[in-house]
Amino acid sequence: MLNFFRRLLGDSNEKEIRRLQPIVEEINRLGPEFARLSDAELRAKTDEFRQRLADGETLDDILPEAFATVREAAARTIGLRHYDVQLIGGIVLHQGKIAEMKTGEGKTLVATLPLYLNALEGKGVHLVTVNDYLAKVGAGWMGPIYHFLGLSVGFIAHDQSALYDPDYIDPNANPEDQRLVHWRPCTRREAYLADITYGTNNEFGFDYLRDNMAYDKSQLVQRELHYAIVDEVDNILIDEARTPLIISGPAQKSSDLYRQMAKLVRQLRRSSVTAKQVKEEGLEPDGDFFVDERTKSIYLSEKGIEKLEKLLNIPPGESLFDPEHYEKTHYVENALKAQFIYQRDRDYMVTPNGEVVIIDEFTGRAMPGRRWSDGLHQAIEAKEGVPIKNENVTLATITFQNYFRMYKKLAGMTGTAYTEREEFAKIYNLDVVVIPTHKPMIRKDLPDQIYATEEAKFRAVLREVQEMHEIGRPVLIGTTSVETSERLSAMLKQAGIPHNVLNAKHHEREAAIVAQAGRKGAVTVATNMAGRGTDILLGGNPDGLVEEFLRKEGLTLETATPEQKRAAWEKAKALTEAEGEEVRQLGGLHVIGTERHEARRIDNQLRGRAGRQGDPGSSRFFLSLEDELLRRFGPVERIKGLMERFVDSDVPLQAGLLDRTIESAQTRVEGYNFDIRKHTVEFDDVMNKQRQIIYADRKAILDEADMRERVLDLMAEEIQRQIDEHLSDGVDEFGLTELLRVYRRIDPTLPATVTAETLKGKTKEEIEQFLLDHLETTYAEREKAIGPEVMRTVERRVMLGAIDRQWVDYLTAMDELRQNILLQAYAQKDPLVEFKRESFRMFDELKANIAHDIVYNIIPASFQYEAYLRQIAEEQARRLATAQIAGGSSEVEQTRKPQRRTVQQIGRNDPCPCGSGKKFKHCHLGREHELAAFMNNAPATTPKVEPQPVKPAIAEEAAKIKAAIDNGTLPAASPKTPRGRQPQAVPRGKKR
C-alpha cells in the first residue's frame, strides 16, 4: 500500500531533485561562457556579485552565475570540476538543508559552492568539521579556489589559527602535502575576519564561550553567527547533542570518599533478577542491587540499602536518605556505575601514565581531555586505582544544539542522515535531501548471519576473513569496542593472517592504516568507522607508499631529492592503480560488521566504506543472540532456546523474522535516544534564553562606553528598596539606624555626623532624596579623583565581575535543580513545568544578586581602584587561561557550595578592607561582624592582594575627602533632576 501511494504521489526526495534541475541546467548553460573568460575577468566576478548584492539583488538571483564561477575556478586551480549532482548538493546546502551524500561523492568540493556564494555578503561563513586535521586539510585543499576568486580563508584549531597564503611556506609542514604548507599564522580574530573560516565544532563553540568571558572588546574574536555548513552533521548535531561544551575551573572536593566507595561497592552482590523482571513480573531482587541495561541505571534493593547503611556506619534509626547522609548516595551511585556498568577498553581506556580516557562509543576514538560529569570520572579513577583529579565547577557552558541554532542559516552534509530526518526537522528545522550518486551504487549488502553465541559468531567471522584473504580481497572488520577489536586481532594472529588494528589505542597510525585498507589482501580491524573522514581507495593510496619505497632505497623524506620523491611517487601510483584494477575484478572491498549498533545510521556508515564512486564491494553483519542490542531489546531467550535445541552452534540463522526484530530494536532505541535528546533540548531551552539575556548584557557593557547612568540607577533602586524595608512602619530610630548602616556599605563617605537622630524629623521622601543626592555627589567626587576614564574602567570591571561571579554560582544551582526536579514526577507534577517555574524565580534572584553585587562594590572599588583592577586582572587571567585550555573538555560540571570570603587578621593601622580609605582602627574596629557581612557581599572569588602604596595625588584627594567626612562638610549635591521617586504627574523615561 505504501509503495502504491509513493508511486501515485511521487517520492518527495525525487520531486525536490527534479525541482532543482532547471538551476543545474542554467549553471551548465553558463559553463562555456565562463570558460572563455580570462583569469582576471573570472576573478572580477566576485566584485561584480558584491556590487549587485549591494544594489538589491539576492543570493538566489546570482546563484547560477556564482556557482558557474566557482566551478570554472576549481577546474583552473585544483583540476577538479563539479559534477551535476555536486551542483545539486551545493544548492541544497545554500538553501539551509542537509545534503546526504554517500562516501566518496566529494563533499569537500561541494561545500565550496555555497561557501563562496554566502561569503559574498561579507558577514563571514563557517565550515565545521569533526577534527582539526580535516579542517586544515579541507581548507588547504580548497584554498586555491577561494584565493583565486579574491576571498580570504581562515583556519582555527585548539592551539593554532592561520590564514591561507599561497606565498607563505610553513617550515614545519610536510612540503609534499600542498594542503598543509601555505598556512600563515595569525590572530584568532583575523581568522574569524576572513571571508570563510574552517574549524571544528568544539573550537567554534568554545570561542563563543570565551567571547562571553571577555573583559575587554579587544579580546572578542567571533563575529555574529551568520551561515555555517556542518560536515558529518549527524555526528555533531545528534551523537554529540547531549554533550555540552563546558569551560570549568577546579572545585575542592575530597578524593577519599571516592576511594572508600570504590572499595565498599565491591562487597555488594548483583541481583540475578533483571530490572525488566522486577518491573514487568514483579519479582523481588535476590541481591543488593539490580541493573537496568536499557537505561544504564542501577537500583539498590531494600537489602542493599540496609547493607550499605551498616557499611557506612549510619547510626540505628537513621537512613542513608536522611539529609545529613544524602550526599553519600551520590558517591555510592557513581561507584556502582563505575564498577558494574562502565567497562575498561569499551567505555574508557587507561593510559600508561595512569589517566582514564573516554572512548567515543560512536567512532571508537579516544577523547583525551574529556571527562564524565557529576563525579563519575572520579569514581572510575578510584575503581582503576589511578590518581583522582579534582572535580570542577562550571564557568560557562552551552550545548551544540543551542550553539548551532544561533546561526541565521545552518546547513549540513553527511553520508547518513535520512534515518534521522524527523529529529533534524523537529529540533533544528532542517530538511534532509538525499543527493543521487554520480555513478550507480553496485555494492552488495548480504543478509545478516545470526548465531546463538558470541564464540560461534567470531569463529564465523574468522572463516569469512580467511576465505576473502585467500582470494586477495581487502577486508574491513568493524567492531563496537576496543575489547572486541583486540579479541579479533588475537584470533587473526593465531590464524596467521597479517592485519592492522585501528582503535583508540592505535589512533596515531589511523590515517596510514585507513589509506592502505583497500590494498590487495589487506585486513583491517577497526572500531566504528564513523567520522574517520578518510576514503578507502581500492589498491591503496600512493601518497602513503612513497616513504616505504624511499626507505627500501635507504632514503627518507628529508634526505631524498625532489626527483627521487617524484620517482617513488610514480612507482607507488603505478602499483596502486594496478592493484586497484585487480581488486575490482575480485569484487572490491568486503566489509564485515561484528555487531549491530543502536543506530542504523552507524551501520550504514560502516557499509558505506565499500562501493565508493561506483566501485564494486560487499558487506555482511555477523550477529549473536548475546550481542548487547539483542540482549537489551530483542526476544532473545525464546529464540536462543530454539536454536540450542534444533541448530548446530556453527550454523547461522538467516530469518526474515529476526531481521525485522533487529530493525525494530534499532528503531526503538533510536526513538528512545531521540526522546532523551528532545527532553534535553526542552530543559536546555529554558537555560538558553537566560544565557542569551546574560550574554547580551555582558556584550552591552563591553560595547557601551559609559555605564555611569545605569550604575546610578541600580544604586537608586537599592536605596529605595532599603527605605521601603527599614521604614515601612514609619520613620523611627531603629529603622533609621539600620538604613544608615546599610547605606554606609554602599557609600562609606557618609559623614559620621549623619545619624538617626539628625534625620528623625524628616519624611521618608526627604530621607530618600538626601541619600540619593549624597550618593551622586560621592560618585562625582570619586570620578573627579581618579579620572573619568579610570572610573569607566572600574564600572565595566565591577559589572562584568558581578555578572561572572553570580553566573557561575547560578550554573551550579541550575544543575542541582535539574537533577532534583525529576523527583517532581513522583509527586504527579510535570518536571518541565516545575523546572520552568523554579528557574524563572531563580533567574529573577540572579538579576537581583548581580545588581546587589554591583551596588555594594562600585564606590569601595573606586577608592582602591589600582588594587581592585589588579585583582580583577588576575582573576580574568586565570579565567581566560582556563578558557584557552578548554578545547578538549566536555561534561565536567560539578556542584559546589557557595564560597564565602572570611576576614583575615587585620592590624589596627592597616587600611580597612571595606575600601573606605580609612585605617581599620578608625573604621570597622569593634564592628568586625559588619565588616564580615560586607566582605561576604564583595567578590567571592577575588584573590587577596596586599595593600598597595597610594599615589600622592590620590592620597591628597583621599585626605580631603577624609577631612570633609570628619567635619561633616561634604559639598552639596550639584543642582540636577533628583534621582528618587518622582511625582506621578512627571513622566519618567526609565525607573531609577
UniProtKB/Swiss-Prot annotation:
Zn(2+) binds at C912, C914, C923, H924. Part of the Sec protein translocase complex. Interacts with the SecYEG preprotein conducting channel. Has a central role in coupling the hydrolysis of ATP to the transfer of proteins into and across the cell membrane, serving as an ATP-driven molecular motor driving the stepwise translocation of polypeptide chains across the membrane. Residues 885-910, 965-992 are annotated as: Disordered. HAMAP family: SecA. It catalyses: ATP + H2O + cellular proteinSide 1 = ADP + phosphate + cellular proteinSide 2. Its cofactor is Zn(2+). It holds the Pfam family SecA_SW. The keyword Nucleotide-binding applies. This is Protein translocase subunit SecA. ATP binds at Q86, G104, E105, G106, K107, T108, D535. Keywords: ATP-binding, Cell membrane, Cytoplasm, Membrane, Metal-binding, Nucleotide-binding, Protein transport, Translocase, Translocation, Transport, Zinc. One of its GO terms (molecular function) is metal ion binding. Belongs to the SecA family. The lineage of its organism: Bacteria, Bacillati, Chloroflexota, Chloroflexia, Chloroflexales. Gene3D superfamilies: Helical scaffold and wing domains of SecA (1.10.3060.10), P-loop containing nucleotide triphosphate hydrolases (3.40.50.300), SecA, preprotein cross-linking domain (3.90.1440.10).
